[in-house]
């Protein structure tokens, strides 16, 4: 019997021609430091081959309509099942997506309301439920005799016919924000006080406004209420004006219609055709809850059917845990003849909901906009959707499923994994969390280092075998023998010695009103189970409040007060990808490439050939490769196969023409290298070569300090992992005095091996040493243990959370009976 997959000669990314056997029907964990080749093995080889081979069994017609993976760079892969992957960063959903649509629970609910609800006739009378609805028959109202049809499930969908006509099913309407129209009321209208007239309309409006009786030479704040009303809402009257163009010095007389400030924005919005146009307009807009559907997204007709006495929009506002109980009672609330159909529909709902409850998502409501969910919540939503159907013989590749999960949430995740294996599936688990790696039947450890020095299998075997293996780097963390307390935390009585940031909020989402103090100049970690309100408190309250205070703008509606004296900068460092195209590289983002271009332009070789610094740009310069326009890749359209991106045959992926290789720079040690050769080096090697080039060396040393020494200078930034992107964003901040700055990190340990977490703590310490205040949203216990101050939220998720249940030093949290986080410390 075949009990393992065989991989021979895998060379994807940095894999060093490895051979490895992977057990089938088991949970196989892949561990290793960041950049060691874990994802290359799991996604680049196993998933790529498993999904590709399955799709190749389909017809050409079907394959043309799918995004297909290209063949992996591997000599041989045997016995790989059809594969499904759950990626580390699920895509950010669109404005129309909700928790209900994303989990497809809303489909079952719409079916319930279409088939099982009491429907209302056009004259407002409710009919009893009957099988006539399911049969598609015409209904007759017993009170007024009117004939009508019950709505179908599609007519109850806010993405189809059931959408509110005012907001088109989004639940929000965009209205003009009067505060944004005049951002600085100390200016006069002549000086440009009315912002939309400067950017969206001819400057003529100032002259016409003067003709309307408004003084344009006094500060806007000193205008009368009537004058301000003319500016914002004045009538569209035609005025005869004398016009003088300052640029061309031409003058003339014109008849022109007045566009008030509000209409200027509305008119521009109606003509927007692309993202660029929207960018110009959206700064003058604010989003309000739709006044017609009150944010439910549904039309009045879609809100009329009643089941168990309530409408579809009311059901969608229930938390999932309450909704499951409500659905359980639906069949018994109906006539005997309706129950078999009701039980069938409700059963489909309950089986999907059970998975979501197991994964700890019972606190979410179906109407919650999917774009407001955290990464961890979106990932578990994706997992529940993938495992909904009880398949067998599938290979599930899970890329860091523990992201965003509190240690107490991991139990539900491991339960789902064991269920999948019990059903006859295989699991490949890429993760760093030792709590979840301990659930694996077999571990494959990649290493020994990142990048070019990685790509080898350094250890494999069962957990006990790995713990005994001297070559393993994860072993001390699995066995619990590694030291995890790595920095000297502030003493309890000195925590607030530098002052505090005070935040006061009213209710938002499921987060209750909060009063919170954050010590300045310290490392504060915000903890709590998934859905307890960490994101709402920090990303949706603290950051917008500080931003408003720093820029002298009105506070967001739910912020009561913010006191942050001396704070002039707020910086969010999150895991969103850097750049969206292949032209953004590590060297360009870190500001090294511009410096190198100047140095190469000063070289003897460049001077002899007449090259300037601009010629060394691979985006526009004379030395870029003409075959690929400096991207390093060429896209081939192969009709019935997916588009194939291959390294450019002219420059072999270097982005530069052959002439660039002839221009060499000589370093202090007498070594010579061209710019394309230098771009092919990793940061550590480049530091050695650039030892005598002060500015370049300093910038590269910061990347090394951030634990990014293994990245090559020419590596594309969109391909970096979340953790790498986060640390690269910090490159420009390290080394500056930061006493007026607050840095907020959203789960910076994503994708980090316990050894890499030590580097991250060193980064925090470097910021703290320069006076910064560091706030971290985190589940990683090693980061939490090293905090100066912890704010623990909970106790549960959703309505069961949203409160601060404990604050203090790690020791105080550990001793606090109310803190769930404390139990794991």
Residue positions per predicted region:
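Conserved phosphate-binding elements of NTP-dependent enzyme cores
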Residues: 1-825
């Amino acid at each position: 019997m075949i009990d393992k997959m065989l991989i021979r000669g895998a060379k994807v990314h940095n894999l060093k021609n490895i051979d490895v056997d992977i057990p089938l029907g088991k949970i196989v964990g892949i561990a290793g430091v960041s950049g060691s080749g874990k994802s290359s093995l799991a996604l680049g080889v196993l998933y790529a081959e498993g999904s590709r081979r399955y799709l190749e069994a389909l017809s050409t017609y079907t394959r043309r309509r799918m995004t297909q993976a290209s063949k992996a760079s591997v000599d041989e892969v045997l016995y790989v099942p059809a594969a499904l992957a759950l990626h580390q960063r699920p895509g950010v959903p669109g404005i129309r997506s909700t928790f209900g649509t994303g989990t497809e629970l809303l489909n079952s609910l719409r079916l319930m309301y279409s088939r099982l609800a009491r429907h209302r006739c056009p004259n407002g009378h409710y009919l009893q439920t009957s099988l006539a609805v399911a049969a598609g028959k015409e209904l007759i109202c017993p009170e007024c005799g009117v004939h009508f049809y019950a709505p179908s499930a599609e007519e109850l969908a806010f993405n189809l016919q059931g959408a509110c006509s005012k907001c088109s099913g989004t639940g929000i309407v965009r209205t003009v924000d009067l505060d944004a129209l005049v951002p600085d009321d100390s200016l006069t209208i002549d000086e440009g006080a009315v912002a939309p007239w400067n950017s969206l309309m001819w400057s003529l409006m100032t002259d016409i406004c003067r003709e309307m009786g408004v003084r344009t030479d006094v500060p806007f704040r000193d205008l009368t209420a009537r004058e301000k009303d003319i500016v914002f809402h004045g009538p569209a009257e035609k005025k005869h004006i004398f016009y003088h163009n300052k640029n061309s010095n031409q003058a003339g007389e014109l008849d022109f219609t007045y566009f008030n400030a509000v209409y200027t924005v509305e008119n521009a919005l109606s003509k927007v055709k692309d993202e660029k146009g929207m960018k110009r307009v959206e700064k003058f807009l604010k989003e309000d809850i739709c006044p017609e559907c009150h944010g439910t997204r549904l039309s009045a007709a879609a809100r009329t059917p009643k089941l168990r006495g309530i409408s579809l929009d009311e059901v969608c506002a229930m938390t999932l845990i309450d909704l499951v109980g409500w659905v359980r009672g639906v069949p018994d609330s109906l006539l005997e003849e309706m129950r078999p159909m009701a039980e069938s529909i409700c059963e489909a709902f309950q089986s999907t909901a059970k998975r979501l409850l197991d994964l700890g998502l019972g606190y979410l409501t179906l109407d919650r906009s999917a774009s407001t969910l955290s990464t961890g919540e979106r990932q578990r939503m994706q997992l529940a959707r993938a495992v909904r159907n009880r398949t067998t013989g599938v290979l599930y590749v899970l890329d860091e499923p523990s992201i965003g999960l509190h240690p107490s949430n991991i139990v539900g995740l491991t339960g789902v994994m064991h269920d999948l294996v019990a059903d006859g599936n295989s699991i490949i688990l890429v993760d760093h969390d030792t709590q979840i790696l301990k659930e694996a039947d077999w571990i494959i450890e990649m290493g020994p280092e990142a990048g070019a020095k990685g790509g080898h299998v350094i250890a494999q075997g069962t957990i006990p075998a790995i713990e005994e293996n001297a070559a393993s780097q994860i072993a001390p963390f699995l066995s619990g023998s590694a030291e995890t307390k790595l920095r000297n935390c502030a003493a309890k009585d000195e925590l607030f010695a530098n002052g505090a940031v005070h935040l006061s909020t009213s209710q938002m989402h499921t987060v209750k009103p909060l009063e919170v103090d954050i010590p300045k100049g310290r490392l504060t970690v915000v903890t709590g189970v998934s859905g307890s309100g960490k994101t709402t408190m920090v990303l949706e309250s603290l950051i917008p409040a500080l931003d408003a205070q720093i820029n002298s703008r009105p506070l967001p509606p739910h912020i009561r007060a913010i006191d942050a004296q001396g704070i002039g900068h707020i910086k969010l460092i999150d895991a969103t990808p850097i750049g969206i195209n292949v032209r953004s590289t590590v060297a360009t983002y870190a500001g090294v490439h511009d410096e190198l271009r100047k140095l190469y332009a000063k070289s003897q070789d460049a001077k002899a050939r007449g090259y300037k610094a601009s010629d060394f740009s691979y985006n526009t310069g004379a030395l870029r490769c003409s075959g690929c326009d400096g991207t390093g890749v060429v896209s081939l359209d192969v009709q019935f196969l997916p588009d194939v991106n291959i390294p450019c045959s002219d420059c072999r992926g270097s982005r530069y023409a052959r002439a660039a290789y002839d221009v060499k720079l000589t370093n202090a040690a007498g070594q010579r290298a061209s710019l394309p050769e230098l771009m092919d080096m990793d940061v550590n090697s480049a530091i050695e070569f650039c030892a005598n080039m002060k500015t370049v060396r300093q910038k590269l040393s910061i990347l090394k300090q951030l634990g990014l020494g293994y990245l090559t200078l020419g590596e594309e930034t969109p391909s970096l992992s979340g953790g790498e992107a986060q640390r690269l964003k910090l490159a420009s901040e390290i080394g500056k005095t930061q006493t007026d700055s607050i840095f907020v990190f959203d789960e910076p340990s994503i994708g980090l091996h316990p050894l890499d977490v030590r580097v991250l703590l060193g980064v925090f310490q470097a910021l703290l040493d320069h006076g910064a205040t560091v706030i971290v949203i985190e589940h990683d216990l090693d980061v939490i243990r090293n905090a100066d101050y912890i704010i623990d939220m909970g106790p549960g998720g959703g309505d069961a959370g949203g409160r601060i249940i404990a604050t203090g030093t790690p020791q105080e949290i550990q001793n606090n009976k109310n803190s769930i986080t404390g139990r794991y410390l």
